[in-house]
Amino acid sequence: MNLRPEEISSIIRQQIEKYEVQVEVTDVGTVIQIGDGVARVYGLEDCMYSELLEFPGGTLGMALNLEEDNIGCVILGSYLHIKEGDVVKRTGRIASVPVGEALIGRVVNPVGEPLDGKGPIKTDRFRPIEKIAHGVVFRSPVDTPLQTGIKAVDAMIPIGRGQRELIMGDRQTGKTAIAVDTIINQKGQDCICIYVAIGQKASTVANVIQKLHEEGAMDHTIVVVAGASDPSPLLYIAPFAGAAMGEEFMEAGKDVLVVYDDLSKQAAAYRELSLLLRRPPGREAYPGDVFNLHSRLLERAAKLHPNIGGGSMTALPVIETQQGDVSAYIPTNVISITDGQIILEPDLFYAGVRPAINVGLSVSRVGGKAQRTAMRQVAGQLRLDLAQYRELAAFAQFGSDLDRATRARLTRGERMVELLKQGQYNPMPLEEQVMSIYTGVRGYLDSLPADKVRDFEIEFLKYMRTEKPEIGEDIKVNQKITPENESKLKAAVEEFKQMFVTQHGLS
């Protein structure tokens, strides 16, 4: 092999001509204290609030306290390898998450990293997790219903698209069940759902995800998970990440449902971070801005004006109460922020009334305007009647000498309570809800034993689906009960009741 000197010198000359000194200027700081997931960093004088900072090993942190001589930074991951004296770099990026269609059907953590083993999220679109909510002029009134598929909710506490409806109750009273049923019921409704699990056990979240898969609901759902074992900063940012993902679809003119399950754990995580950052504690040791924490999150739910797309984002925040105490700090905060609340009671739950909704305390402040006409026709007085029944039932325990009208009201109320019971993962279409409630409010169940009401409903709806499908179809198309259709429905109910009474030997 012959080496020619002129070739070698030519190559060296080319390399020298191409040589370029590249100097990268990076703003760096130094870790002066680390512990409990919080780092104090000296330097970084131009750092922004909520900016992501890079620690050794690629671990990211988020700047939350900008003080005179140092920065309080929470670590978004493991901090065990970080030590005093380590160099910290600015990234120049505010905390952001990936957004867009690529996330639908996926399970991700609060920074958008996949947790489902299906490969990376293929999207080039990102959004900051924090964003100022749309102003009044960009919003329009809530006027379209969001059907939950749950009779008790759709009839008495209707939810509209763009509303914030709080679900509140003690542990193990069915809060998540209502939220998951609502997500399942959005199948085919052109509504994208985001389920944000905050501080829950991994087994609980896995069960929810499995159920969503079984019901075919993951095709329109994104699941954001910050588990009980994750660092507090991830629990703190998880709801904001879910809101950012939802806003992307809302601003594209689509309807979105976001479930925050639950915000009590986010508030506890924020309290932990605030105390570690040496912020002054207030009531129940929460920081003074914990109200703002939830208000700036929930205000992002909106029904946008048609001029800017007309999309909507509905929020269903969940709050866990202790021993039914709805007057505690976080529950009262969120009640005052939201447009209504669904309150669940353990006593009703253990008595077999499921969903265990306390009709007297639950309310929807704006959803009534969005309720379908058909439902309003049959359920207009239902909420008031049930509240009166509860009072009468409590009074009737102390004496049996009741007049006929009171006994009739108790009989009707008892059967309506039975009628409104509904199994989990069994959402019901609007037309079937309307026909079912019609049988109760028109008195067709009064002469039946209370323990036969559920059987009557199941068999009646099966009969209507097979023998009289045109009645339900008319309600579905017109969204109301026309006089002609009501006469058909009345005849069908009377005909079926006669068959049911004969079949079960109740005559």
Swiss-Prot record:
Catalysis performed (reactions): ATP + H2O + 4 H(+)(in) = ADP + phosphate + 5 H(+)(out)
Pfam families in the cross-refs: ATP-synt_ab, ATP-synt_ab_C, ATP-synt_ab_N
Subcellular locations according to the entry: Cell membrane
The keyword ATP-binding belongs to this UniProt entry's keyword annotation: yes
Assigned EC number: 7.1.2.2
Domain of life: Bacteria
Disulphide bridges: none
Gene Ontology molecular functions: ADP binding; ATP binding; proton-transporting ATP synthase activity, rotational mechanism
Description of how the protein assembles with itself and partners: F-type ATPases have 2 components, CF(1) - the catalytic core - and CF(0) - the membrane proton channel. CF(1) has five subunits: alpha(3), beta(3), gamma(1), delta(1), epsilon(1). CF(0) has three main subunits: a(1), b(2) and c(9-12). The alpha and beta chains form an alternating ring which encloses part of the gamma chain. CF(1) is attached to CF(0) by a central stalk formed by the gamma and epsilon chains, while a peripheral stalk is formed by the delta and b chains.
Protein's recorded name: ATP synthase subunit alpha
Gene symbol of the encoding locus: atpA
